[in-house]
Amino acid sequence: MAAKSDGAAASAGPDPEGAAGGARGSAGGRGEAAAAAGPPGVVGAGGPGPRYELRDCCWVLCALLVFFSDGATDLWLAASYYLQNQHTYFSLTLLFVLLPSLVVQLLSFRWFVYDYSEPAGSPGPAVSTKDSVAGGAAISTKDSAGAFRTKEGSPEPGPQPAPSSASAYRRRCCRLCIWLLQTLVHLLQLGQVWRYLRALYLGLQSRWRGERLRRHFYWQMLFESADVSMLRLLETFLRSAPQLVLQLSLLVHRGGAPDLLPALSTSASLVSLAWTLASYQKVLRDSRDDKRPLSYKGAVAQVLWHLFSIAARGLAFALFASVYKLYFGICIVGHWSVMTFWVIQGETDFCMSKGEEIIYNMVVGIIYIFCWFNVKEGRSRRRMTLYHCIVLLENAALTGFWYSSRNFSTDFYSLIMVCVVASSFALGIFFMCVYYCLLHPNGPMLGPQAPGCIFRKASEPCGPPADAITSPPRSLPRTTGAERDGASAGERAGTPTPPVFQVRPGLPPTPVARTLRTEGPVIRIDLPRKKYPAWDAHFIDRRLRKTILALEYSSPATPRLQYRSVGTSQELLEYETTV
């Protein structure tokens, strides 16, 4: 039985041979457990599972502190401009606070409506599941609120008490209260705060509950953390980044000693940008069992890397904008257009539809105005080097144009600003090298990334065996009658002739003692798994998420996810082409 979820079918069946779900360790130090990845496309959910730790709780509390400090300083600064009768600065500051917040709250409330709404007559995504234990009962469900049935469609054995009118009334009252609370929270622009607190609550519940409920709460915590990290990433680059450039340009234009309140607002915006980027990368790696999780030391190194890089970038923008306002806008639009086109050319695969993918690429283009953001799997060394060279040239050009128009009575002040831009960019590159050389989850990334034919340490040849056919023949020449007669004579004479078709040799089968798996069903998703650094489909597709949570909560054992493997289809296609 198949289930559609935005074009994807999800089903759960017997555990395939070799499809073992690897367990991950604790939230803070799960690198060793995640290293032993299973077959491609299998998302492990069995075993002891991860464990929520105290430092995870502290990380969420620090994220809340950064969120409140950024918003409070911006509103305080806007009120200060209003009291000083600086209505232009007041309007711009308030616009950069309210407009991104409204966009993010609408998106967050839209997600809430979909997650908590019950379908009315429309068939939801159907999922069928069969236990991996021999003879286990098959279960199927429609959407997260559907009832589970046996394979024949009859209700599961056992008493099925009908809900009383009192319980149904209490349930409706609870749902009404939740809707009213969420509406009030989002009207107060506190949707992200609610999601942070809910992620904290779910993480603590996963630590205190039993094994089965612990895994369920941990999955919910990962889903909530993914949502709030994506919302924060969108909001910070729509709010904090323009706010940073605006306040820095005002400070440079005024000159002299900076005021306390604009300096606090600028610092809070800068920390918010750096923290959001590091938090996004950490949650993304924690959500994928095929990648090693990011340690907190690596996350702090990323915060420092982005902090100094964005500071240099923002200060260069502010210096140039304080003198050439019109040309600054042209430079920003031009850089965004080039970066967006570059991202689109890379053919990213983050969203479930083409329209959402284009919007995502446009947002990534905004991020590329200020800092590096990896959107494509593979060795990103060349792309990262090219990007930082472009940023270095732009920073030098923007600062140079500002320095050429300086006032000669403030040469020392101008020289200090140039040195701050250069040293901040250098510190950002330094912490980036520290992260990639010492704290990257996969080990040092700036040395030789993998042994191969070029390096002497390779224990095996890189090429395929001599007797293996790696590509199909381009054409088969037509044989003539003389060749056929010669071939027949050769066969009669006993001379060996080469075979027409050759089968590529495979690995010899090794006898493995197979045991029945008892850890639960496997939820099969009829989609190829998205490559890192993209989110998995069950984090993006909310219907698929609801179905997985329903199966995970109702199953006596923790199910595992298996995406469609593209290896088998590629092998079949290559075989058909060869024949």
Curated annotation (Swiss-Prot):
Chain residue ranges for the region called Disordered: 1-40, 146-165, 466-510
InterPro entries assigned: XK-rel, XK-related_scramblase
Biased composition (Gly residues): 19-31
Disulfide bonds: none
Record-annotated membrane-spanning stretches: 59-79, 89-109, 260-280, 314-334, 355-375, 384-404, 415-435
Biased composition (Low complexity): 1-18
GO biological process, one term: apoptotic process involved in development
Keyword Cell membrane: yes
Membrane association type: Multi-pass membrane protein
Pfam family, one: XK-related
Keyword Transmembrane helix in annotation: yes
Keywords of this entry: Cell membrane, Membrane, Transmembrane, Transmembrane helix
An annotated GO cellular component: plasma membrane
Location(s), subcellular: Cell membrane
Similarity comment: family membership: Belongs to the XK family.
Name used for this protein in its record: XK-related protein 7
Gene, per the UniProt record: XKR7
